[in-house]
């Protein structure tokens, strides 16, 4: 095996293991929101996009409707469609199963690893290695987190309410940094989303404020058109 392939695999597996550990936090958060172990596992296996999963259980845990929970998850998941368009020429998967697998594993981390690779072959290797490691780790730790949370006492279970916002922020912050390189702008956008959610909380059904805050941040981060001649 060449040094380049070894380095690509090492980086992919390392990133996959690190990100996969968030699955334990999701499993605990899903339990706190009232989902059982199997429901948490099905979400991780079929949805497989961390920020959307945390948004969904966060809305459900706050008493929001299923429609609001799905809406917030879909809003956060739309970026994967853009990633898919970018990765399609690079991966060029053949066969129904490979295309379905590639589409399912199009997330932030696999996209970043694939497009950062120096050539197409290493890009494909980085995508599949990162996707496989994160997928296996995420689902395994989801089960462990849900099982561990279900065995906690009442006081400890109440403390799980802090998991959703903390893990949600940890997953979203790198995206916010990419959209807004300046630290001061990052803080203003994050604070603006929080203000939107707080102002709407007494006025709208539970969960709707989360969707509105996500929309506000997404609109703030949309690409700006440059003026002609600039």
Give the label of every model feature segment.
Residues 1-47, 58-73, 150, 226-230:
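Helix-loop-helix hairpins and the membrane-proximal interhelical loops
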Residues 3, 32-37, 61-66, 89-98, ...:
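Juxtamembrane helix-boundary/capping and inter-helix hinge elements in multi-pass membrane proteins
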Residues 13, 41-42, 69-71, 98-102, ...:
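Hydrophobic alpha-helical transmembrane segments
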Residues 21-25, 38, 49-56, 79, ...:
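Transmembrane helix boundary and interhelical junction motifs in multipass membrane proteins
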Residues 48-52, 75-82, 166-172, 214-226:
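Alpha-helical transmembrane segments and their membrane-interface exit regions
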Residues 70-161:
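Helix-loop-helix junctions within the multi-pass membrane cores of secondary transporters/permeases
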Residues 82-91, 112-119, 170-180, 219-230:
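C-terminal ends of transmembrane helices
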Residues 122-212, 219:
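Membrane-embedded alpha-helical modules
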């Amino acid at each position: 095996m060449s040094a380049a392939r070894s380095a690509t695999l090492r980086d992919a597996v390392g990133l996959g293991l690190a990100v996969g550990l968030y699955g334990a936090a999701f499993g605990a958060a899903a339990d706190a929101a009232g989902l059982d172990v199997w429901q948490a596992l099905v979400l991780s296996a079929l949805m497989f996009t961390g920020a959307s999963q945390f948004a969904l259980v966060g809305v459900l845990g706050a008493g929001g409707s299923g429609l609001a929970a799905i809406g917030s998850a879909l809003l956060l998941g739309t970026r994967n469609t853009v990633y898919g368009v970018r990765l399609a020429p690079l991966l060029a998967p053949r066969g129904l199963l490979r295309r379905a697998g590639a589409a399912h594993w199009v997330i932030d981390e696999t996209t970043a690893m694939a497009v950062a690779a120096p050539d197409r072959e290493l890009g494909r290797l980085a995508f599949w290695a990162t996707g496989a490691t994160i997928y296996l780790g995420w689902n395994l730790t989801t089960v462990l987190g849900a099982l561990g949370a279900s065995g906690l006492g009442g006081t400890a279970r109440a403390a799980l309410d802090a998991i959703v916002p903390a893990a949600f922020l940890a997953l979203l912050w790198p995206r916010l940094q990419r959209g807004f390189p300046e630290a001061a702008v990052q803080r203003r956008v994050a604070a603006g989303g929080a203000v939107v959610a707080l102002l709407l909380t007494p006025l709208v059904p539970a969960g709707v404020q989360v969707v509105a805050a996500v929309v506000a941040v997404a609109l703030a981060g949309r690409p700006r058109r440059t003026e002609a001649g600039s």
